[in-house]
From Swiss-Prot:
It is an enzyme of class 2 (transferase). Its EC number is 2.7.7.6. DNA-dependent RNA polymerase catalyzes the transcription of DNA into RNA using the four ribonucleoside triphosphates as substrates. Pfam families: RNA_pol_Rpb2_1, RNA_pol_Rpb2_2, RNA_pol_Rpb2_3, RNA_pol_Rpb2_45, RNA_pol_Rpb2_6, RNA_pol_Rpb2_7. This is DNA-directed RNA polymerase subunit beta. The gene is rpoB. SUPFAM superfamilies: beta and beta-prime subunits of DNA dependent RNA-polymerase. InterPro entries: DNA-dir_RNA_pol_bsu_ext_1_sf, DNA-dir_RNA_pol_bsu_external_1, DNA-dir_RNA_pol_su2, DNA-dir_RNAP_su2_dom, DNA-dir_RNAP_su2_hyb_sf, RNA_pol_bsu_bac, RNA_pol_bsu_CS, RNA_pol_bsu_protrusion. GO terms for molecular function: DNA binding; DNA-directed RNA polymerase activity; ribonucleoside binding. Keywords: DNA-directed RNA polymerase, Nucleotidyltransferase, Transcription, Transferase. Transmembrane segments: none annotated. Coiled coil: none annotated.
Length: 1380
């Protein structure tokens, strides 16, 4: 037999149904976040050689800062990060931000200024490192830890800077005329709009202010009227020819027109075209070939044309007419009488070329540059008197000053592309030529040439990721700082100060803190399961600062656009008001350096598909014809069919195969990660697929994770990239394993500066952001050989390195006594008994002991008026034990607070001092379990302020922590010793020693026996003759000592951190956190779902024996309603059921063979069966080469059910499902006879039975159920608060009042509106009455009525309550004032 391979059982093997080979590697799924932030910080770049981007660019743009007089200057040299004070884990525990101190090197230059000449000479240069606040660091998983919680910065989609042409779709004007507009959007700075109005005059607006004629803007740029006309129009020359005029023949301008009079050749005088004929391109070409040069024209032909140049008498300087004036019966004689016999006119025919700019110029009141500048100044700063200097300065600052206006590289690139310019992308301000080009193109659009832009095209929208958002925020902080620095530089004696004294880093640090703490894009990470983490990091939001708002966003922005293909998922988006505004990045998509989303394609060369992959953005892709990934190819890579379905410029079309330039790399490149995890996605309706993607993110990690039988092949990718499953950083051998850590001795990538040991700490029962449980379990055993990238530990919701969000359940589709009406789900008791859908949730409770005005609060066991029974779970420090079972009302941490009281007499004080009576002056403020939560205490953390004495419990926790650290250090030390001494023996062996430990004979040749006579620590004393080898030994020794001291130093640092007190919020002396784990079994009211949007609520849990059962006696686990399928069109769930049934059947078959083999049969049938299932196909396992032990391992793994992968859009088809069912020896219909569990009779018809992957969603009835007795009231209205978190009541709304009114239930209604709600006096009386055993009550005036009276009074209405009940005397009495 060929060389045998072994299978270690640490990964799940799947039968792969995909037919299309994967050419491109899928990029790391959280690359978006990590790459962006790395580019911003550039920690690893050398200080001198950092490129101008990210943080470096921010500093470069703000510095140098000069003082107002120019006598000193502060320059930026470089920046560096120091090591963070606390690591990730410590920050999580202590509620700190994981950040590194930023040190910036600044140089202060002081000049001497010569008073007479004003020349500068350098007087002094000082350099200094200045601390500029802490910069948050990203964890390995792409998150930030801010105040102890994990947060994600979501990428934002916004409109790309550049120029956009658009029209109003005919909405602005009643005639429905299209009004075109252009808008230049910079990255930062003023917007410039250029737009037509209904009269076809072109206007400009700056920053959406009042409009000015565009010609004023052009004049402000330094052009005069003639120059403006010259730029936008060509001219024709009319020459006087006897009585008439001679005009050049221009075929292009005449195309398609009808002649109104005969066309006469000016040279020969013959008629070349009669009147009333249409001028076709062919006819014009013939005339040109005949040599027609000029035509005859009359005075009438001249009328209506416009002058191209001023008509000036050069001798006297008199201007008869100006450029742009119309020639008519009055003006023509003036020109002729002045003796002009050549008249240049503008080529405006009102058909192909309109007179818009000329009309604007004549309507413009401003005559010259000064008027235009003043006009712009008045628009921008109304009410200020303009001067030439201030107007010029302001106009230049608007668009031409790099500090105020920045197009950014993207903006410049987009502008070049749209306007056909060729300007380097370092020119980031506008130029005169840009503005002219924009106006030109706008006028052409109005003339019917060119297309408007589609703002929803992904070529016009770009992504701002973490790095860029942070960069903008930090720039704001630095600019705030700059003002303060300038003032300080001017106000103090500059010669004596250092850079440190000028800088106050608070504004910069505050900007960072504000961004991470309260920006709309900095979000609390969705951490229900690994998939929700990954999806959150890949999210693209159109909301946020500088983006859209929900209310303003229309339908177009939210809609799926053809350019989304392969870039943004068309399926995964929230339902509700954010639909389409929050999207997810597609699986293969990546963001390029300009912020545009790119998608990969395979190149096609000479009609053959190659494996070269290119990434293209939406703009670049429009040029090509792109074939789909599932196009049929021949063996040599050419297309089988003559015509191929392809995409081109946003349209799907059939094109000849020779025209195709690119091809998709994979069918799943158009969907997001969550959608790519849905098998048979292609058979589901899109709306249900959307729900399926969204609900997978809400699946709670279960106690026992189980990978799906029917997967898509994406599961291992998600588990690895999310960081839930731990992958080995480098190859090696497992040295130690326990539940909390794995120690691997590295055998590859051995770098002398790094330790040769990898220690992987596993998270045990940690609380996630959503209170689910994060727990990692090792998969390896001591001695295992590990390769780089192998999965060595499973995390939450992972199983053998596969994502496992739910469990495979045996499902029957049939109605069952109405218990699955309307999507309800019927479950078997087995599911509860075997903990199939049991999950662990961890709640965190924290209590603080503060320093109050009346004295400090105290955490203690000594609580007044509490029975010993209630204290049974507390230790002597008053803190609950780990492992205690707690229920609602139990004390977790005992705490007493001093309470104020009346001043004491001196005698009382004396007695109090003698007898130390305590109970009267403190009250019990202990932390108790909230209603409705039962659980087990799994962890307690105690934090003390610096200098506060630690209690017994805190000391114990500290000791435990230090022991753990010591163990880590000792293990690493042991492996280091073992490695180093093994290398030392190899170096010494075979050499002759010239010196050695005490009692060693010189000149002996060293062997293992000789060396082992001495203790290890003395081996270093051997000296050998070979000098080179001796040098190596000494180098080894130095390296060993350094590693050892580094280990010890790290240990000491950690211990010091543990022993040192903690940073606490002001006024807090001590803080205790208690973590309680709650085991939640599934129960009626919990929400469950499949992966196809098939969701429902558990309606009943039925005893196992009552559930329907199969012929072999197996009871089904779940009964679903078949009516949930047809109307919702998610047929994928049925295909999954059949395929899951086949997988389980196949598993049973393999299990039976495995048992036979164990009982002594031959292994060959087992090997053949496994090979026939898993070994076939393009990604098959090499079963034939596996040794027997591996086959047994594989059989054990597959006996519950064979795992298969059916990738989206390239998965199993009906024939494959049938084949699998046949292989497993099951009916091809996928239906079985079922028996009623209660009567034992068969059901009338065959029922579809199979395995579906079911998820338990994070909508548990325990978290929702809630009942209020007496609770908090709202301050103003005195009505009960609402919601479970506030322990609120239920709203009795308007409609409910109508219902009681309809029933005439007057007393019930009165009770609802008064004593049960906001009649303050009444509700206390009712309470007293109930205590007395009396059940009558009297309703008073509701507080909300008083609020109404107060509001009316505040409007100036005098409202009083009068009692109209007449007493005996006959006078009316005044009621007490309602509002008092």
């Amino acid at each position: 037999m060929a060389q045998t391979l072994s299978f270690n059982g640490r990964r799940r093997v799947r039968k792969f149904f995909g037919k299309i080979p994967e050419v491109a590697e899928m990029p790391n799924l959280i690359e978006v976040q990590k790459a962006s932030y790395d580019q911003f910080l550039m920690v690893d770049e050398p200080q001198g050689g950092r490129p101008d981007e990210g943080l470096q660019a921010v500093f470069k743009s703000v510095f140098p800062i000069k003082d107002f007089s120019g006598a000193s200057m502060l320059e930026f040299v470089s920046y560096e990060f120091e090591a963070p004070k606390f690591d990730v884990e410590e920050c999580r525990q202590r509620d700190l931000t994981y950040a590194a101190p930023l040190k910036v090197t600044l140089r202060l230059i002081v000049f001497d200024i010569d008073e007479d000449t004003g020349a500068k000479s350098i007087k002094d240069i000082k350099e200094q490192n200045v601390y500029m606040g802490d910069m948050p660091l990203m964890t390995d998983n792409g998150t930030f830890i801010v105040n102890g919680t994990e947060r994600v910065i979501v990428s934002q989609m916004h409109r790309s800077p550049g120029v956009f042409f658009d029209h109003d779709k005919g909405k602005s004007h009643s005639s429905g005329k299209l009004l075109f507009a252009a808008r230049v959007i910079p990255y930062r700075g003023s917007w410039l709009d250029i737009e037509f109005d209904a009269k076809d005059i072109v206007h400009a607006r700056i920053d959406r202010r009042r409009k000015i004629p565009v010609t004023s803007l052009l004049m402000a740029l330094g052009m005069d009227g003639e120059e403006i006309l010259d730029t936008f129009y060509t001219k024709s020359l009319y020459q006087r020819d006897g009585e008439g005029w001679r005009v050049p023949f221009q075929p292009d301008a005449l195309k398609g027109q009808k002649t109104l009079a005969d066309m006469i050749d000016a040279d020969t005088g013959e008629v070349v075209v009669e009147s009333g004929k249409k001028l076709t391109p062919r006819l014009l070409r013939q005339l040109q070939e005949k040599g027609l040069k000029a035509l005859k024209a009359t005075d009438d032909d001249l009328y209506g044309n416009y002058l191209a140049e001023d008509v000036v008498n050069f001798e006297t300087g008199e201007i008869y007419l100006e450029a742009g004036d119309e020639i008519d019966e009055k003006t023509l004689p003036v020109i002729l009488s002045a003796g002009f016999d050549e008249i240049p006119v503008l080529d405006i025919d009102h058909i192909n070329i309109g007179a818009y700019i000329r009309n604007t110029l004549s309507a413009d009141k401003n005559e010259n540059r000064q008027d235009a500048l003043f006009d712009i100044y008045r628009v921008m700063r109304p009410g200020e008197p303009p001067t030439m200097d201030s107007a010029e300065a302001m106009f230049n600052a608007l668009f031409f000053d790099a500090e105020r206006y920045d197009l950014s590289a993207v903006g410049r690139v987009k502008m070049n592309m749209r306007l056909d310019l060729d300007v380097p992308d370092t020119v980031r301000t506008l130029r005169k030529e840009d503005i002219l080009a924009v106006v030109k193109m706008l006028v052409e659009l109005r003339d019917g040439k060119g297309e408007i832009d589609d703002i929803d095209n992904l070529g016009n929208r770009r992504v701002r990721s973490v790095g860029e958002l942070m960069e903008n925020q930090y720039r704001l902080g630095l600019l705030r700082m700059e003002r303060a620095i300038k003032e300080r530089m001017s106000s103090i004696e500059i010669d004596t100060v250092m850079p440190q004294d000028l800088i106050n880093a608070k504004p910069a640090a505050a900007a960072v803190r504000e961004f991470f703490g309260s920006s709309q894009l900095s979000q609390f990470m969705d951490q229900v399961n690994p998939l929700s983490e990954i999806t959150h990091k890949r999210r693209l939001s159109a909301l946020g600062p500088g983006g859209l708002t929900r209310e303003r966003a229309g339908f177009e922005v939210r809609d799926v656009h053809p350019t989304h293909y392969g870039r943004i998922c068309p399926i995964e988006t929230p339902e509700g008001p954010n639909i389409g505004l929050i999207n997810s990045l597609a699986t293969f998509a990546r963001v390029n350096k300009y912020g545009f989303i790119e998608s990969p394609y395979r190149k096609i060369v000479d009609g053959k598909v190659t494996n070269d992959v290119v990434y293209l953005s939406a703009m670049e892709e429009a040029k090509y014809h792109v074939a789909q990934a599932n196009s049929v190819l021949d063996d040599d890579g050419s297309f089988s069919e003559e015509f191929v379905v392809c995409r081109h410029a946003g349209e799907v079309m059939l094109a000849p195969r020779d025209n195709i330039n690119l091809m998709d790399v994979s069918p799943k490149q158009l969907v997001s990660v969550a959608a790519a995890l849905i098998p048979f996605l292609e058979n589901d309706d899109a709306n249900r697929a959307l729900m399926g993607s969204n609900m997978q993110r809400q699946a709670v990690p279960l106690l026992r994770a189980e990978a799906p039988f029917v997967g898509t092949g994406m599961e291992p990718v998600v588990a690895r990239d999310s960081g839930a499953a731990i992958a080995a950083r480098r190859g090696g051998i497992v040295d130690q394993v326990d539940a909390t850590r794995i120690v691997i001795r590295a055998t590859e990538d051995l770098d002398p500066s790094k330790s040769g040991v990898d220690i992987y700490r596993l998270q045990k029962f940690q609380r996630s952001n959503q209170n689910t449980c994060v727990n990692q379990r090792p998969l390896v055993t001591v001695g295992d050989v590990i390769n780089k990238g192998d999965i060595i530990a499973d995390g939450p919701s992972t199983d053998l390195g596969d994502l496992a969000l739910g469990r495979n359940a045996l499902v029957a589709f049939m109605p069952w006594n109405g218990y699955n009406y309307e999507d309800s789900i019927l479950l078997s008791e087995r599911i509860v008994r075997d903990d199939v859908f049991t999950s662990i949730h961890i709640e965190e409770f924290e209590v603080m002991a503060r320093d109050t005005k009346l004295g400090p609060e105290e955490i203690t066991r000594d609580i007044p008026n509490v029975s010993e029974e209630a204290l049974k779970n507390l230790d002597e420090a008053g803190i609950v034990y780990i492992g205690a079972e707690v229920q609602p009302g139990d004390i977790l941490v005992g705490k007493i607070t001093p309470k104020g009281e009346s001043p004491m007499t001196p005698e009382e004080k004396l007695l109090r001092a003698i007898f130390g009576e305590k109970a009267s002056d403190v009250r019990d403020t202990s932390m108790r379990m909230p209603p409705g939560t039962f659980g087990t205490v799994v962890e307690v953390r105690v934090f003390n302020r610096h200098g506060v004495e630690k209690d017994e419990r805190a000391m114990a926790i500290e000791r435990e922590e230090i022991e753990r650290l010591a163990k880590d250090r000792d293990d690493e030390q042991a492996i280091l010793d073992r490695n180093v001494y093994a290398r030392l023996v190899d170096m010494l062996r075979g050499h002759v020693a010239v010196a050695g430990p005490k009692g060693f004979k010189k000149g002996t040749e060293l062997s293992n026996v000789v060396i082992s006579e001495y203790p290890r620590s003395q081996w270093w004393m051997f000296a050998i003759e070979d000098e080179k080898a001796q040098g190596e030994i000494e180098a080894l020794r130095a390296q060993y000592d350094e590693s050892k001291s580094r280990l010890e130093q790290r240990f000491m640092d950690k211990v010091e951190k543990v022993q040192r007190g903690d940073e606490m919020p002001p006024g807090v002396m001590k803080m205790v956190k208690v973590f309680v784990a709650v085991k939640r079994k599934i129960q009626p009211g919990d929400k469950m779902a499949g992966r196809h949007g098939n969701k429902g609520v558990v309606s009943r849990i039925v005893p196992i024996e009552d559930m329907p059962f199969l012929e072999d006696g197996t009871h089904v686990d779940v009964v679903l309603n078949p009516l949930g399928v047809p109307s919702r069109m998610n047929v994928g769930q049925i295909l999954e059921t059949h395929l899951g049934w086949a997988c389980a059947g196949m598993g049973k078959k393999i299990g039976a063979m495995l048992d036979a083999y164990k009982a002594g049969a031959d292994i060959q049938p087992l090997r053949d069966t496994i090979d026939s299932v898993i070994g076939s196909g393009p990604k098959g396992e090499p079963i034939k080469q596996y040794d027997d032990e591996s086959i047994v391992r594989l059989a054990e793994q597959t006996r519950r059910g064979v795992s298969i992968a059916t990738p989206v859009f390239d998965g199993a088809v009906e024939a494959d499902v049938n084949e699998m069912l046949e292989q497993a020896g099951l009916k091809v219909t996928g239906q079985s006879t079922l028996y009623d569990g209660r009567t034992g009779e068969t059901f009338d018809r065959q029922v579809t039975v199979g395995y579906i992957y079911m998820l338990k969603l994070n909508h548990l009835v325990d978290d929702k159920i809630h009942a209020r007795s007496i609770g908090p009231y709202s301050l103003v209205t005195q009505q009960p608060l609402g919601g479970k978190a506030q322990f609120g009541g239920q709203r009795f709304g308007e409609m409910e009042v109508w219902a009681l009114e309809a029933y005439g239930a007057a007393y019930t209604l009165q009770e609802m509106l008064t004593v049960k709600s906001d009649d303050v006096a009444g509700r206390t009386k009712v309470y007293e009455a109930i205590v007395r055993g009396d059940d009558t009550f009297e309703a008073g005036i509701p507080e909300s009525f008083n609020v109404l009276v107060k509001e009316m009074r505040s409007l100036g209405l005098s409202v009083e309550l009068e009692n109209s009940k007449v007493d005996d005397v006959g006078s009316t009495a005044q009621l007490p004032d309602a509002a008092e």
